[in-house]
């Protein structure tokens, strides 16, 4: 009887020990799960310097940001601002809420982000479409000159008068990425074409841009590209009145007047926001400067790199689109290297 009882006790103790070993193993697995959960619980916030409204630049960026958050398991939030003071307050709030990455965009954000990032060297920031040279900021730019090259090539192939124009905002380095890229693309397919260029003197002068576009139309230009930001509205008005063809910038403006606005040079802010958050999620995010071009889907041209809701204008036509697509492929492969006007001197 005693021997039997001893045997039962031994079996019981072995069972307890085995159960304890099992508990230790489960605890280790649970700890690994918690670690994975911690990785997935990263938080990122998009703080915009103005209200999204119907601004396609910010609408696209917000969409790409949220898409990446959902796909890569990052908690994301978008904060809109009503004015510069509110924007700086929102950046401070994002820091206080301990977001792992704080992203923003455009030159409007430069001053406030420079201040907040300097005050918080341990936080990670990213800014799109401008450059802030700080050790805790990732600046994301665009190779606008590659998109402009495609636009210039399309204009050079489509023009019937061999006179092509552009209304640009100002004669400054940033705008040269548009004007010189366009000029290079135009000359590559139509070296005999005449290129007219005028500057509106700012980014918001609708009346001046319209006036200059009419002057170019009277000189025989049948295609006049808009590169004057808000001033492009004046170019669009002139196109309706004078019957020439034009193009928009950043987002697909063809939907506003497909008869006259036949192309748009694109900045893919949705792709940028998505890729930057993806890099943050997988650990490849680095501070410093990075630039997105055709290869990275950062820039493009309607009908060539992205479809449009608008019908393709007969002025452009499928033959021109196909030729420009081939040029796009040559740029992506490196067969054609478009000159960066800011690095060419």
Show where each model-derived region lies.
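Positively charged n-region of N-terminal signal peptides that target proteins for export
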Residues: 1-7
